[in-house]
Curated annotation (Swiss-Prot):
Keyword Cytoplasm: no
A molecular-function term among this protein's GO annotations: rRNA binding
GO CC annotation terms, alphabetical: chloroplast; small ribosomal subunit
NCBIfam families cross-referenced by the UniProt entry: PRK05327.1 (NF003717), rpsD_bact (TIGR01017)
Purpose: One of the primary rRNA binding proteins, it binds directly to 16S rRNA where it nucleates assembly of the body of the 30S subunit.
UniProt keyword rRNA-binding, yes or no: yes
UniProt KW keywords: Chloroplast, Plastid, Ribonucleoprotein, Ribosomal protein, RNA-binding, rRNA-binding
Entry similarity comment: Belongs to the universal ribosomal protein uS4 family.
Major site of localization recorded for this protein: plastid
Descriptive protein name: Small ribosomal subunit protein uS4c
InterPro entries named in the record: Ribosomal_uS4, Ribosomal_uS4_bac-type, Ribosomal_uS4_N, S4_RNA-bd, S4_RNA-bd_sf
HAMAP family referenced in this protein's UniProt entry, alphabetically: Ribosomal_uS4_B
Domain S4 RNA-binding: 92-153
């Protein structure tokens, strides 16, 4: 499946707040469409609940269905809670780290910065948004828009990262924990969704 390029606020109205997808806040808190306001009346099936949790993760981090399934399979092979390992792998992607450092307004914008070669990791230009950042790696950019956004960023940088806003330089201090992930999602439902695949 290709990258999603459609209306983003429509997705936020259906799934809830997705900070990595868009910074816009919808005016209406019900799904778009003719039956949007009354859609909250119907009982959601267990499948739909799990599907919506999975879609939240997909749209927030901008990964395809195939990529997400690959992350789930990799998390299953690792030791530890599968759901937390899945979130940790997604959060340690280079585009997600660039976004969380405050260098970009969304993960989508961070992905574009990375793929255009505007971000370096330990002094080397990395153009792969899915690159897994490790502890101790230094992420830096000299691009004017990134430096400007880093200086004016008013959000909170998670404690597993450290940032120098004036130089647009950040460092991965330690692995991310579940409490530091800025997305409200039930990872156990996502693992259950993929349990048959």
């Amino acid at each position: 499946m290709a990258r999603y390029r459609g209306p983003r606020v429509k997705i936020v109205r259906r799934l809830g707040e997705l900070p990595g997808l868009t910074t816009k806040i919808p005016n209406r808190n019900y799904p778009a469409g003719q039956h949007g306001p009354s859609s909250g009346m119907t009982k959601m099936s267990q499948y739909r609940v799990r599907l919506q949790e999975k879609q939240k993760l997909r749209y927030n981090y901008g990964v395809s269905e195939k990529q997400l399934l690959s992350y789930v399979r990799r998390a299953r092979r690792m030791k530890g809670p599968t759901g937390e390992l899945l979130l940790q792998m997604l959060e340690m992607r280079l585009d997600a780290v660039v976004y969380r450092l405050g260098f970009a307004p969304t993960i989508r914008a961070a992905r574009q910065y990375v793929s255009h070669g505007l971000v370096t990791v330990n002094g080397q230009a990395v153009t792969i948004p899915s690159y897994q950042c490790s502890v101790g790696e230094v992420i830096k950019s000299n691009s004017a828009p990134i430096v400007e956004h880093a200086k004016t960023f008013g959000g909170v940088v998670p404690s597993h990262l450290s940032v120098d806003k004036n130089n647009a330089t950040g460092k991965v201090e330690r692995n991310v924990t579940r409490s530091q992930i800025g997305l409200t999602v039930n990872e156990l439902l996502i693992i259950e969704f993929y349990s048959r695949k």
